[in-house]
Regions:
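Acidic (Asp/Glu)-rich catalytic clusters
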Residues: 2-10, 31-40, 66-91, 114-126, ...
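Acidic/histidine-rich catalytic cores of soluble enzymes
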Residues: 6-11, 26, 43-44, 153-290
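Active-site beta-loop-alpha junctions enriched in small/polar residues
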Residues: 16-21, 47-51, 94-97, 135-137, ...
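Aromatic/hydrophobic pocket-lining residues that form the small-molecule binding cavity
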Residues: 29, 71, 75, 108-115, ...
């Protein structure tokens, strides 16, 4: 299916609030919101750490992550600041390690306590969508048979509480659902109208095509030619099997090839290599990365999807150690990148 560039001009654009400034030390939220608005984005993804940090400046102390009264106060104030700048709060993120805990486990009790609290935050922030990332809890701690039921139950709570939606994302370091096929299979089985996919260029290409633990930066479980063919077939399958209405958004970022290959082992916090890569090595497309970002975006567009393109980057520079970022210039660059990406999706080459 050929893409018509004219049909892409109405795609709405969002920028993740956590994605301006060094990942290790982001600047205050309000200047970031202003930079995002000045770059003509129309919405943000509201990141939970930004609620905590803005809450600290608002309240004079950092809110406890489970003090939902204070968190809702901060979220409501963020909504007010977004309203002043004509920014919608498109989604609250990232809700993690929710699904698959055994019955009566402390993990399950914690997950549901957080879920109820985050629903309150959604209401305060004025958003109708919650991003749920596929859990990276170690498999030996999970009951995989509960995954679908847990997400179905959460979807029903979201629907009852406010007509809210659940966008399920494959995190490429997830212990049980690292690929788009995995989350799509789960979403189909959940079978709720308010549950769809959060697809992501990094999570797809970074999981199926790239690998931060190899010298080449690519997966080496097959030969180079077979890798390209396998990835091409995966994207063709994505384009031909996922209904456009089940894609709630596409998140966009590239990745730097890491200076030296990561260990294949999890770090001291339990985070897997691709999770570490994700945290600090994700620039905008056309800015030093090497993933086939446009190939993924093109496949998503071929489903007929024309919804949110949301730029979620964690740009610590090629060495992951960047300390200073001109956030106004960076947001403007992201706006330019959006046009280049759409052009490449249609023509095979980015615009100048």
């Amino acid at each position: 299916m050929a893409l018509d560039q004219a049909s892409l001009q109405t795609i709405p654009t969002s920028y993740a609030s956590c994605s301006l400034g060094p990942p290790s030390k982001p600047p205050p939220l309000l200047p970031r919101l202003q930079a995002i608005a000045d770059a003509n984005f129309t919405a943000i993804e509201l990141s939970f750490p930004d609620i905590l940090s803005h809450g600290a400046s608002l309240l004079g102390h950092t809110p406890d992550p489970k003090n939902y009264d204070e968190l809702c106060t901060a979220a409501a104030q963020i909504k007010s600041e977004c309203d002043k700048r004509s920014l919608a709060v498109m989604m609250l993120q990232p809700f993690s390690n929710f699904e698959g805990w055994p019955a009566d486990s402390s993990g399950r009790r914690d997950a549901w306590e957080r879920a109820r609290g985050w629903v309150r935050i959604m209401r305060a922030a004025g958003t109708d969508m919650l991003q749920v990332g596929s859990s990276d809890t170690p498999l030996e701690e999970l009951d995989r048979g509960r995954v679908v039921d847990d997400l179905r139950e959460l979807a029903d709570v979201l629907a009852e509480e406010g007509g809210f939606r659940l966008a399920y994302e494959n995190w490429c370091w997830s212990s049980h659902a690292p690929d788009w096929r995995d989350v799509w299979s789960i979403v189909k089985e959940v079978d709720r109208p308010n549950v769809g996919l959060c697809l992501d260029t990094f999570q797809t290409a970074g999981g199926e095509w790239a690998d931060p633990t190899t010298a080449s930066g690519k997966r080496e479980d097959v030969g180079a030619e077979e890798l390209e063919d396998r990835f091409r077939r995966s994207l063709e399958e994505l384009a031909s099997t996922i209904p456009k209405e089940k894609i709630f958004l596409l998140q966009i970022s590239d990745a730097y090839k890491v200076p030296s290959p990561f260990s294949t082992e999890a770090d001291e916090s339990g985070l897997r290599p691709r999770g570490r890569w994700s945290h600090d090595f994700r620039p905008l497309p056309y800015n030093g990365g090497y993933l086939p970002v446009a190939d993924v975006a093109r496949a998503v567009l071929k489903t007929g999807f024309r919804g949110w393109f949301s730029y979620e980057v964690f740009d610590g520079g090629p060495d992951g150690q960047r300390k200073d970022v001109d956030i106004k210039a960076y947001a403007q660059a992201a706006s330019i990148v959006h046009g280049k990406l759409l052009t490449e999706c249609v023509t095979g080459k980015p615009s100048a």
